[in-house]
């Protein structure tokens, strides 16, 4: 009976984790409808908040935070064109995160990392095949996959439950997400926990996870993902000076050296660097953050600052 309870709890938590990360841009919200997905996450979150009476002090503080977040969103809605659905959408995310953690706090991080690991492994394999044989090598299965909206006269993406074939980013690994930037956020989170929480897994498992997360992050060709890798590695090497985990430190150093050699000495690595760095901020011969996707970010930041200054 105890085994059945543990197994059921494990399955439920994996399901909650999948739905939790689906809110970051996977296909499930669009497949069942965004409004239905918001209602689903709210009900799932509320169910486990009310069902289990553990973590009382944490729950009291966290629910207070969610309540304050919801009412602050309502104040924004009153003075804008946003709807109540926006407030529910924003508050449903921290609620489902807390409920997922509360199901089994002791195994939450391990299961989160394992699920991301298998998603990353699948994405690396499928992305490698598309790079070798072409994006259309899977065209025969596209009609059987979930199709997203149309953009520029063609379907934006196919799939999205475990892997997504995104036509706009056919040369980048988006994982099950609609954009590589969304995917790198999840990968960077998993990489952080596996690097800075050594007690979660044995050393061999950690090395295996780190290598897969590194490879997946590199193939996203996400500038923010590359910046995240640099920051995580720099902080880890400083942190590891006080630890005795020599094997992990050497594994990361070897991975970094291998990545640098790949980027600098292979044609594919040079293409990656051109996509991530030069085409985004250095295309006109000088440093310019207004180019391509960098422009979308800097323009929005400058617009917000201008609005604050004028009002």
Regions found by a protein language model. Name each.
Residues 286-311:
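TM-adjacent membrane-interface loops and short helices in multi-pass inner/ER membrane proteins
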Residues 1-54, 70-77:
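N-terminal signal-anchor transmembrane segment
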Residues 113-137, 160-221, 226-239:
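Alpha-helical transmembrane segments of multi-pass inner-membrane proteins
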Residues 45-51, 76-133:
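Transmembrane alpha-helical segments and their membrane-water interfaces
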Residues 107-116, 204-207, 242-255:
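Membrane-interfacial entry segments at the cytosolic side of transmembrane helices
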Residues 125, 129-134, 240-287:
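A membrane-periplasm/extracellular boundary helix in multi-pass inner-membrane enzymes
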Residues 19-26, 159-176, 295-301:
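Juxtamembrane membrane-water interface segments that cap and precede transmembrane helices
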Residues 3-15, 53-67, 109-115, 205-208:
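Membrane-interfacial loop-to-transmembrane alpha-helix junctions, especially the N-terminal start
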